[in-house]
Amino acid sequence: PDIPTDGMDRRAYLRAKFGGEARAQRGYAAIARAGISAGIEFNFDAIDWTPNTIDSHRFVRYAQQLGKGAEAVERVFQSYFLEGRDIGDRSVLVDIGAELGFITDRLDAYLDDTSTIQNILDHNARAHRLGISGVPAFIVDGQFSISGAQEPAVIGRLLDVARERQRELLAGEVTG
């Protein structure tokens, strides 16, 4: 949601976020290796435009209301990271919605209603306060977070830290 409304050239985005394409490529290479081990073949070269994702987030919220949130997230991610589609483009989101069996007129009406934008921006601001700056992101117990592609050991450590904090809190209640 922090990208300009119309999105931006991918190379300009990579320079701004990572300090250059070469640094981004090193990070993407690690993500690609992790993806291959999970059976996912990322196609970062197909991405030439970095979209503003507010409507993508709103699309997922709509899908959640229909009980298809997980499917919507997966299809949006596939569309962007595997197919290089512009997931900030309303017509792309409506096409994905049609694939998922949504009534596209209703989806269009939902996306036309701008009243849900502030909620997305509020969630984004909260994520930034928690230190989240990329996807995927994990928040445990509302206070511990990591973002971006992480090794399983890092995620395990996050869970260990949260578990230890819960033990400390429970011990304080018992003795306090």
Describe the predicted segments one by one.
Residues 1-83, 169-173:
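Structural alpha/beta surface segment adjacent to cysteine/selenocysteine redox centers
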Residues 61-176:
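C-terminal cap of thioredoxin/glutaredoxin-like
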